[in-house]
Amino acid sequence: MEGSVVVSEKKRISSERRKEKSRDAARCRRSNESEVFYELSHELPLPHNVSSHLDKASIMRLDHQLPAVEKVADAGDLDGETELDKQLNCFYLKALEGFVLVLTEEGDMIYLSENVNKCMGLTQFELTGHSVFDFTHPCDHEELREMLTFRNGPAKKRKRTNHREKFLPSYEMYINQSWKNREYKVSHMEGPSLYRTHACIYDNANNQNHCGYKKPPMTCMVVICEPIPHPSNIEFPLDSKTFLSRHSLDMKFSYCDERVTELVGYEPDELLGRSVYEYYHALDSDHLTKPNYNMFTKGQVTTGQYRMLAKKGGYVWVETQATVIYNSKNSQPQCIVCVNYVLSEVVEKDLILSLGQTASVLIPVESQEIKMPEIFTELNEENNSECLFDKLKQEPESLTVLAPDAGDEIIPLDFSSGDSDKPYEDVPLYNDVMLHSTSNKLESTPITPLPAPEMPKPLRSNVDPALNREVVIKMESNPRTTCASIHHSTAIQARQPFRYQFQSEPSTEPNTPEYCFDVDSEMASEFKLDLVEKLFAIDTEAKAPFYYPGNDLDLEMLAPYIPMDDDFQLRTFDQLSSLECDSSIPQTLGSMTTLFHQSLSPSTSDFKPEDAMSDLKTIIQSPVHMMKESTSAPVSPYNGNRSRTSSPVRPAKAVVDKTEKSRPGTPNLPVPLNKRCTILDEELNPKMICFTQCTAEKRKMESDGPLFQAIGIGTLFQTNVDPGPNSSLQWKRVKGSDSERLSSAEQRTILLLSTDMASQLLGQSFDGTVLPQLTGYDCEVNAPVHGTRNLLQGEELLRALDQAN
């Protein structure tokens, strides 16, 4: 028992010794490792306060990249560095807006400058030794690999290949080490010469190993990475060689800084609405395509150096930092803000590279008002032979200023006589508000010559065929005073406008548009506002003889226009076909046909004007609505003469028939002339023939009569004839019956238009009473207000509605 206890005690002691020995060995290894890393950290070209705080992983990464950095450093000419260069080395990083980055062919970052912390938020030692692909956006990896790939060229071009230039666009690097929440910042990679990257092959003389073999060359890429600032973070004012611009999404200027004028020569207003591609040098257009593409994909870009065309020739070297501004509401691109750095003066000023640089396009035209005093200048005695036309021919732009406007006075000037020259210094042509002058001096002042503003001598031109010896000037004086003072030209010449030779008819009003412009008569009538006022008023004064030739009277043009919204199936004059006339009506109708259609009926060959006037008086005194009615009822209410939308019968197509035939099954109702007039007299009211001449208010007829009194088509007059017993029945049959038609296929209505002469004739015939001036819309829509005893009642109304439908 005791022996077993002794054995177990020995085992325990031995195990403790082994553990202690292992701890001592581990402690010794750690101490040795620490000593090794301490020595390695001191081997690094870093300050003691920096190297003493490095961890083992950082020391290993830095020591691993140190030989590569030494190779890059040995490739440079360090022996030629002066004392001044050594003093300025500390200021280079302060002046540099970015950081220096050295990449190997595999993408390892073997060196970064100390100021990388200001740009990326990561220290120099946290990034050194890592791969650049760990800190860039995945979308930029392929582009970076393409830049890092070195391709050997032919032997004769090997020297050029050793310094291969490649344009480097922007790339993005995240600014913290959190892999779950990365934030990227756009940086631009640029090389030491013209902002292009140089992939250099460093081949030292002592590049042989211990065995005598030559080491492979060290290939690396040295770039300068500059972060692109956001426009909101730019410090203002900008540099004197910098101007700001804003563009739309299609790269058209929407704003430009005024500093562009002194740098490039363009005015800001000249660039607005123009594309920025118009000002790129043709050789740089392809290089700028990719940066503009990256601008929309990454949000920011730096174009690198390119040539921008100057205004008057040549170009300047420019570098642009472009930023896409997004809408805060929908995150859509809104505009592009560019900060343009002009890097040089205008190069090759005499070289024209674009049509926009030509003087004929870009030189602004001087104002025409400035040239006006140069035209009206004094003619010296030795220059009298010089013609005014030659002066105006040298400056054709001034002729456009001399063209008159609507309403201007046209005053021809006589250049042959100068005896009656008078100074015009005291005569005010215009006052402060460009109104007619009220000076009395114009009444006694001739307006024929127009002198220079400061000289009393007028213009003279003896040989001036192109201007027809007239000069059009603009004057806003009293027309009566001006016309009275023109004593060198006739009244007709004074009122003729300045027109071409093919002008045939002069205008009669000096203030109308056709006085200054050769316009069509229909277009000119639109400008005559006084005629519009006359349209809504009746003038009892006769302006022209009451004469309407048959060939010029177009009934279709006289028909009222009815919109589609008001296109109801209303009764019109041609549907009132149930009335029948006796044998005396065709005779009267024949006389009216003879009066208005002289060339159509063969019986009018012996017609005379005296008979026509006598027949006209007889017809006006006889209140008869004469018409020839059709018995053939069309199927559709909108076809034929039944429809109110159908065109009236032309006079040339009408043939007067003196016989009337009734449709089979329709009884003939002969109505004497005196009873038919009684019906019309009964329907009329004294209020019917009273009207107002108000042009704004719509005139309505207060009557209970039919549509005969509506539009002045067909005349209804009052006579003292006793009404017949069948007048009410006959009138109802006129309004409601479609079956009682006459057999004629055409209808003729006597038209007495509401013109001035018609008003005068009616006033003379009926003791001052006149008919109301109404439109077709009033006739067919307005219903009688009172006198309902003559309206359809009961079964007759239902029968009329059935026939209308």
From Swiss-Prot:
The modification (3S)-3-hydroxyasparagine is found at residue 782. PANTHER family: HYPOXIA-INDUCIBLE FACTOR 1 ALPHA, HYPOXIA-INDUCIBLE FACTOR 1-ALPHA. GO terms for biological process: cellular response to hypoxia; intracellular glucose homeostasis; positive regulation of DNA-templated transcription; regulation of transcription by RNA polymerase II; response to hypoxia. Efficient DNA binding requires heterodimerization of an alpha and a beta/ARNT subunit. It is found in: Cytoplasm; Nucleus; Nucleus speckle. GO terms for molecular function: DNA-binding transcription factor activity; DNA-binding transcription factor activity, RNA polymerase II-specific; protein dimerization activity; RNA polymerase II transcription regulatory region sequence-specific DNA binding; transcription coactivator binding. Residues 8-26 have a biased composition (Basic and acidic residues). Contains two independent C-terminal transactivation domains, NTAD and CTAD, which function synergistically. Their transcriptional activity is repressed by an intervening inhibitory domain (ID). The keyword Cytoplasm applies. The modification 4-hydroxyproline is found at residues 404, 560. In normoxia, is hydroxylated on Pro-404 and Pro-560. The hydroxylated prolines promote interaction with VHL, initiating rapid ubiquitination and subsequent proteasomal degradation. Under hypoxia, proline hydroxylation is impaired and ubiquitination is attenuated, resulting in stabilization. The gene is hif1a. CDD domains: PAS. This is Hypoxia-inducible factor 1-alpha. It comes from the Eukaryota. The keyword Transcription applies. Residues 1-26, 628-669 are annotated as: Disordered. Residues 303-346 form the PAC domain. InterPro entries: bHLH_dom, HIF-1_alpha, HIF-1_CTAD, HIF_alpha-like, PAC, PAS, PAS-like_dom_sf. Signal peptide: none annotated. Residues 85-157, 229-300 form the PAS domain. Residues 17-70 form the bHLH domain. NCBIfam families: sensory_box (TIGR00229). Functions as a master transcriptional regulator of the adaptive response to hypoxia. Under hypoxic conditions, activates the transcription of over 40 genes, including erythropoietin, glucose transporters, glycolytic enzymes, vascular endothelial growth factor, HILPDA, and other genes whose protein products increase oxygen delivery or facilitate metabolic adaptation to hypoxia. Plays an essential role in embryonic vascularization, tumor angiogenesis and pathophysiology of ischemic disease.
